[in-house]
Structure formats: structure tokens, C-alpha cells
UniProtKB/Swiss-Prot annotation:
It comes from Paenarthrobacter aurescens (strain TC1). Its EC number is 1.2.1.38. Transmembrane segments: none annotated. This is N-acetyl-gamma-glutamyl-phosphate reductase. GO terms for biological process: L-arginine biosynthetic process. Catalyzes the NADPH-dependent reduction of N-acetyl-5-glutamyl phosphate to yield N-acetyl-L-glutamate 5-semialdehyde. Pathway: Amino-acid biosynthesis; L-arginine biosynthesis; N(2)-acetyl-L-ornithine from L-glutamate: step 3/4. It comes from the Bacteria. Keywords: Amino-acid biosynthesis, Arginine biosynthesis, Cytoplasm, NADP, Oxidoreductase. It is found in: Cytoplasm. The keyword Cytoplasm applies. PANTHER family: N-ACETYL-GAMMA-GLUTAMYL-PHOSPHATE REDUCTASE, CHLOROPLASTIC-RELATED, N-ACETYL-GAMMA-GLUTAMYL-PHOSPHATE REDUCTASE, CHLOROPLASTIC-RELATED-RELATED.
Length: 343
């Protein structure tokens, strides 16, 4: 089975990562490669690491250029995907790597994004309860945010098994600078980032907060309240999330560990590490893998889960390709058999 794929937003980090993975996919032929302000440029000028595609010329991001493909990846800023997606044929598999179709609550979308809600699509995180089935045959898929990917993988087993309390969840995530996109910003230049760490979106202001609460609430079957703080760290890619929650009365460490093991032992890309080994972002760099470890703080009655992912791969493009594979009935791991990079 060979499928034709178009990729929009190909000059950015997310679009470039989608192309990197698709270039090694055994079932994919890459069709239109589009950008907006960079239309007419050689891809190799903007994505010099994509050697096999370097001579391709970027087309303008229009419905006409994206139509006629089996699959369309939209790696566009929030607010830009919905208008294009609405005009693409219903039978085309459209995978939105932006935020436009993730949230179920229209009021939450309007509060955090300041525009009209475009609707909700099946959520592209197959490891969540029920999501793999929801993605089979889907023609519209919303790729999760990078922070929610790590946070939901970290805590969902506890909430899905009624082991955690819902009103005291604290999540702190450290991210590399590529999570902020490719546009030039003063706070992201080398002189500002090197040798420094800084929080942002503090006090519940980050747009991924309602997405994290949504996913954990779905797992728990009741509302979950989350305090989320992201931190910018001096590396190009990767996320290390530390997520903590109060455990229910009488819940033991053995019960916690068993719940996480049961959730992920058979997953191809999510791994609970052996006791005593802790996640590092370097170990998953460039791969679709997530690694995690958990501990139980008996003094405070909290579980602490750390989870490392590559924000551009498992946190964006890898999750998108994995979801495409499931939707089309392909091998779920096709194009994603990449290990981490060391040193």
C-alpha cells in the first residue's frame, strides 16, 4: 500500500520533522511540500538536513496544492489550520499538528486562544485509554501538544485506575527552545538562552493547561485540576516533565508501579524504566520514544513521575505519523523505528 502525502508548514520545525520521518516511511510518497512566506524557496535552503528532499521547491499553502493527496499534514500556527481543513475533501486524512482541533470545551479554547472554536477531532495520542480504537479509520486527527503528550503519558495510568486524587496535581516541564517555533524572538537567541533557565506561562496562563486537564479528566471520569509551569532550558529539543499528584488513601507503591507497567509494557514507544534508572532527554532525542520513571513520596503522600520525550518527534511529528499509520491500517511503527542519539 502506497499513500500520497502533502505537508504544509514545511519550512518550520514541526513540518521539517514530519518530512524527516516520512522520508523513511515505506508506504509513503511525498507529494506537495508547502509553506507560506517561503513559497518558491528550495527546501534545502530552509531544512538543510533533509538531503533527499533538498531540491524540492516549496509551494504556496493553498487548498488547491494540498488537495489530491491521501493524507495532508497541517503544521501551521494555531488558527490557520481550521480554515484550510474545512475546505479539504472529506475522504482525505487531515492531520493537524496545530492546536485548532484539540480542545473539547469551546469556552476554554476562546479563553486561551481568543478566537472561535473550530470543533474537536479524534486525539492523536494512541497510548491513552480508548484512543487507538478512536483513531482507526479516522479522517480528521488532532495531534496533541508537546507538553500534554509528556504530561498525559506520565499521569494517565494513575487516574485511569482511580489511584490518584483529582484536586492537587502539579506539573513542571522543562523544554528545549524548538518548542517555541522557528520565528526569531529575542528571548530565544543564543546569548539569552545559553547558561540560563526561565519559566514562562506561570500561574495557569499556558495554553496547554486546559489540554492537560482535559486528558486527565477524561481518564479519571471527573474533573482534574492542574497547576502547570513550563520552563525554557538551554537545549534545542526535548522535554522533561515532572508530574506529581496526591495518591488515594491506602494506595501502595506496588499498586502504582503495577498500574504504569500494565499501561505501557506492551506499547512500542512508551517505556517504564527499571527501578533506579531515571529518564534523560538525550536518550530519546530524534526518536518517537517516551521514557518514564515513578517514585512514591511517603512523607507527602504523592506519586512523582518523570517523563522524557523529544518535543518534535513523539511530541509532534512522530505522534502525527503514528496516528496516520493507525488511521490507515498500516503497521503502527512504520517510519518510526528510530533509536535515540548518543552521545
Amino acid at each position: 500500500m502506497t499513500i500520497s502525502v502533502a505537508v504544509s508548514g514545511a519550512s518550520g520545525y514541526a513540518g521539517g520533522e514530519v518530512l524527516r520521518l516520512l522520508a523513511g516511511h515505506p508506504n509513503v510518497t511525498i507529494g506537495a511540500i508547502t509553506a507560506h512566506s517561503n513559497a518558491g524557496s528550495r527546501l534545502g535552503e530552509l531544512q538543510p538536513h533533509l538531503h533527499g528532499l533538498a531540491s524540492r521547491i516549496l509551494e504556496d499553502t493553498t487548498v488547491e496544492n494540498l488537495s489530491g493527496h491521501d493524507v495532508v499534514f497541517l503544521a501551521l500556527p494555531h488558527g490557520a489550520s481550521a480554515e484550510i481543513a474545512a475546505q479539504l475533501p472529506e475522504g482525505t486524512v487531515v492531520i493537524d499538528a496545530g492546536a485548532d482541533h484539540r480542545l473539547q470545551d469551546a469556552a476554554a479554547w476562546e479563553r486561551f486562544y481568543g478566537s472561535a472554536h473550530a470543533g474537536t477531532w479524534p486525539y492523536g495520542l494512541p497510548e491513552l485509554p480508548g484512543q487507538r480504537e478512536a483513531l482507526k479509520g479516522a479522517t480528521r486527527i488532532a495531534v496533541p501538544g508537546c507538553y500534554p503528550t509528556s504530561a498525559l503519558l506520565a499521569l494517565t495510568p494513575g487516574f485511569a485506575n482511580n489511584l490518584l486524587l483529582t484536586d492537587d496535581v502539579v506539573i513542571v516541564s522543562a523544554s528545549g527552545t524548538s518548542g517555541a517555533g522557528k520565528a526569531a524572538k529575542v528571548n530565544l537567541i543564543g546569548a539569552e538562552v545559553m547558561g540560563s533557565m526561565s519559566p514562562y506561562g506561570v500561574g495557569g496562563g499556558h495554553r496547554h493547561t486546559p489540554e492537560i486537564e482535559q486528558g486527565l479528566s477524561n481518564a479519571a471520569g471527573e474533573p482534574v485540576t492542574v497547576s502547570f509551569t513550563p520552563t525554557l532550558v538551554p537545549m534545542s529539543r526535548g522535554i522533561l516533565t515532572t508530574a506529581t499528584a496526591k495518591v488515594g488513601h491506602g494506595v501502595s507503591y506496588a499498586e502504582l508501579r503495577q498500574a504504569w507497567a500494565d499501561a505501557y509494557d506492551d506499547e512500542p514507544f512508551v517505556h517504564l524504566l527499571p527501578e533506579g534508572q531515571w529518564p534523560t532527554t538525550k536518550s530519546v532525542q530524534g526518536s518517537n520514544h517516551a521514557v518514564m520513571q515513578l517514585a512514591f513520596d511517603a512523607h507527602t503522600g504523592r506519586v512523582i513521575v518523570t517523563c522524557a520525550i523529544d518535543n518534535l518527534t513523539k511530541g509532534t511529528a512522530g505522534g502525527a505519523v503514528q496516528s496516520m499509520n493507525i488511521a490507515l491500517g498500516l503497521d503502527e511503527t512504520a517510519g518510526l523505528n528510530l533509536q535515540g542519539v548518543a552521545p
